[in-house]
C-alpha cells in the first residue's frame, strides 16, 4: 500500500506541485482580498462615523449659537429700550388726556382720543419710566411726533441689531467649533498613525504646551461686547434719519391701509439697507453686493459699516478685553504672546467673513423676514378684533390687504410697540426669533464656515 502510494506520488509529482501551488496562491489571494475588503469596510465605517460626528457637532454648534443669542438678547435690548423710551412718551400723553378730561369734561376729546386704548394696553409689562425725572414740557403735537419716530426707530433698530447679533454669533461659534474639531481630529490621527505634531506646535497651531487655548477663545468670544454696548447706537443713528424721512410728515390721526403702512416700512428698509449694508434695491434683487477688499491693512480698519459696528478698532481691542474679563484673565492672557497671535488669527478670519458681500445680503434677508413676521402678527391682531372666527397665520397669505379698512397711524404704532416688546422676549419659544435663526441662508453660511478647513 505504501509502495503504491509512493509510486502514485512519483508519477504525479508535477501535478501535485502545481495543485499545491495553486491552492497556496488561491489561499493567499483570498486572504489578501478579504483583508482589503475588511480594511475598506473599516475605512468606510470610520468615514461615516467622522461624517456623523461632524454633522452632530455642526447641529450642536447651531443650537449653541441660538442659545447664546437668547442669553445675550436682554443685554442688547435694554439700552435700545432705554434710549428710545416710547412708554415714557405714552405716559405723558395719557397724563395730558387726563388733565384735559378733568379740566373740561364737556369738551370733546377730538385730539386726545387719538391715543387709543390699544396703545395703552400695549405698554403693560414694558419698561417702567423713571418717576424721579419730571417730564419735559412739550406740546401734544411734539409728543406725538416724538412717539411716532421713536416707536418705529426702536422697532427697526431691534430688528437690525438682532439680525447682526445672530450672524455675528454664528460666525464666531462656527469658527471656533471647526478649529476645535480639526485639532481634535489631527491629535487622534497622531496617536493612531504616529504623525509628528512638533512642527505644528512650534508654529502655534496646536498649543497644548505653549498656551492655554481657552484664553484666546474666551477673548475672541468677548468681542460681541462691541455691538451690545457701542455698535447698536451707530446702527440706531443710521436708522432714525430714514424713519424721519418717510414717516416725519404723516399725522398720527392720518388713516393708512395695512399695505400703505407696509410700503412705508419698506421704503425705510431700503434707506437703511443703503446706509447700513451698502445695498441698493437692485443689489438685493440680483443677490449681489459690494465686496470689500479682503486684504485689510494693519488694524483691520474697514469701510464696511457693519464690520465697524461689530468689531472695534485695533486700538480699542484691549479696552474691550478689560471691560469683559477680570484682572486674573488679563494677566494670564498677556503672559504669552502666542495668545495674542491666536486671537489675531481668529479676528482676521472673522473680519474677512464680515467684509464678504454675502453677509450684507443675509442681514438684509433676516431683517426682511423679521419685518414681514411682525406685519403678519399685526394683521392677525387686527383681524381678531373684527372677525369672530380665529384666523391662523397659515392662511394669512390668502387675505387681500386691500380689503382691509384703513387704520389711524396711532393704532398701527400701538401694534408696532407691542411687537417691539415681543422682540425683546428671549424665550426659546419666541416664534419670530426662531424663524430668524432658521433662515436657510444663515444655515448655509454656518455650513460654509464650519466646513472651511483651508489653513
From Swiss-Prot:
GO terms for biological process: protein import into peroxisome membrane. Disruption phenotype: Leads to a peroxisomal-deficient phenotype and mislocalization in the cytosol of peroxisomal matrix proteins. Affects the assembly of the peroxisomal translocation complex and impairs the interaction between the peroxisomal docking complex and the peroxisomal translocation complex. Residues 113-135 are annotated as: Disordered. GO terms for molecular function: protein-macromolecule adaptor activity. Induction: Expression is induced in the presence of oleic acid or methanol. It comes from the Eukaryota. Residues 113-125 have a biased composition (Polar residues). Its main location: membrane. It is a single-pass membrane protein. Keywords: Membrane, Peroxisome, Peroxisome biogenesis, Transmembrane, Transmembrane helix. It is found in: Peroxisome membrane. The chain crosses the membrane at residues 155-171. Disulfide bonds: none annotated. GO terms for cellular component: peroxisomal membrane. Component of the peroxisomal docking complex, composed of at least PEX3, PEX13, PEX14 and PEX17. Component of the peroxisomal translocation complex, composed of at least PEX3, PEX2, PEX10 and PEX12. Interacts with PEX19. Interacts with the pexophagy receptor ATG30. Peroxisomal membrane protein required for peroxisome biosynthesis. Shared component of both the peroxisomal docking complex and the peroxisomal translocation complex. The two types of peroxisomal matrix targeting signals, PTS1 and PTS2, are first recognized in the cytosol by their receptors PEX5 and PEX7, respectively, which then carry the cargo to the peroxisomal membrane. The peroxisomal targeting signal (PTS) receptor-cargo complexes interact with peroxisomal membrane protein (PMP) components of the docking complex. Belongs to the peroxin-3 family. This is Peroxisomal membrane protein PEX3.
Amino acid at each position: 500500500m505504501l509502495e503504491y502510494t509512493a509510486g502514485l506520488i512519483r508519477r504525479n509529482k508535477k501535478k501535485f506541485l502545481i495543485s499545491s501551488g495553486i491552492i497556496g496562491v488561491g489561499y493567499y489571494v483570498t486572504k489578501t482580498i478579504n483583508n482589503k475588503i475588511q480594511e475598506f469596510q473599516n475605512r468606510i465605517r470610520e468615514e461615516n462615523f467622522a461624517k456623523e460626528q461632524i454633522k452632530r457637532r455642526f447641529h450642536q454648534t447651531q443650537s449653541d449659537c441660538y442659545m447664546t443669542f437668547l442669553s445675550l438678547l436682554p443685554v442688547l435690548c435694554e439700552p435700545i429700550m432705554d434710549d428710545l423710551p416710547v412708554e415714557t412718551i405714552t405716559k405723558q400723553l395719557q397724563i395730558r388726556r387726563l388733565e384735559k378730561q378733568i379740566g373740561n369734561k364737556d369738551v370733546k376729546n377730538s385730539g386726545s382720543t387719538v391715543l387709543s386704548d390699544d396703545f395703552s394696553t400695549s405698554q403693560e409689562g414694558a419698561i417702567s419710566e423713571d418717576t424721579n425725572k419730571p417730564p419735559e414740557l412739550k406740546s401734544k403735537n411734539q409728543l406725538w411726533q416724538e412717539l411716532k419716530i421713536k416707536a418705529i426707530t426702536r422697532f427697526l433698530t431691534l430688528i437690525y441689531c438682532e439680525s447682526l447679533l445672530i450672524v455675528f454669533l454664528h460666525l464666531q461659534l462656527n469658527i471656533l467649533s471647526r478649529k476645535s474639531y480639526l485639532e481634535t481630529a489631527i491629535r487622534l490621527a497622531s496617536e493612531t498613525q504616529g504623525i509628528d505634531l512638533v512642527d505644528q506646535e512650534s508654529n502655534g497651531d496646536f498649543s497644548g504646551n505653549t498656551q492655554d487655548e481657552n484664553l484666546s477663545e474666551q477673548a475672541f468670544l468677548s468681542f460681541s461686547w462691541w455691538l451690545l454696548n457701542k455698535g447698536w447706537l451707530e446702527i440706531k443713528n443710521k436708522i432714525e434719519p430714514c424713519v424721519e424721512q418717510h414717516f416725519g410728515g404723516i399725522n398720527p390721526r392720518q388713516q393708512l391701509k395695512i399695505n400703505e403702512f407696509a410700503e412705508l416700512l419698506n421704503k425705510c428698509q431700503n434707506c437703511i439697507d443703503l446706509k447700513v449694508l451698502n445695498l441698493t434695491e437692485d443689489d438685493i434683487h440680483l443677490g449681489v453686493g459690494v465686496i470689500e477688499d479682503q486684504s485689510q491693512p494693519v488694524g483691520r480698519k474697514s469701510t464696511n459699516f457693519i464690520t465697524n459696528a461689530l468689531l472695534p478698532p485695533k486700538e480699542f481691542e484691549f479696552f474691550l478685553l478689560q471691560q469683559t474679563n477680570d484682572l486674573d484673565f488679563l494677566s494670564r492672557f498677556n503672559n504669552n504672546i502666542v495668545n495674542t497671535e491666536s486671537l489675531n488669527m481668529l479676528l482676521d478670519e472673522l473680519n474677512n467673513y464680515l467684509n464678504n458681500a454675502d453677509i450684507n445680503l443675509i442681514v438684509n434677508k433676516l431683517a426682511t423676514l423679521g419685518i414681514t413676521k411682525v406685519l403678519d402678527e399685526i394683521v392677525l391682531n387686527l383681524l381678531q378684533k373684527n372677525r369672530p372666527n380665529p384666523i391662523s397665520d397659515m392662511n394669512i397669505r390668502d387675505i387681500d390687504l386691500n380689503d382691509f379698512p384703513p387704520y389711524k397711524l396711532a393704532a398701527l404704532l400701538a401694534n408696532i410697540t407691542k411687537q417691539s416688546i415681543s422682540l425683546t422676549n428671549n424665550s426659546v419659544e419666541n416664534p419670530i426669533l426662531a424663524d430668524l435663526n432658521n433662515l436657510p441662508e444663515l444655515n448655509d453660511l454656518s455650513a460654509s464656515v464650519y466646513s472651511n478647513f483651508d489653513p
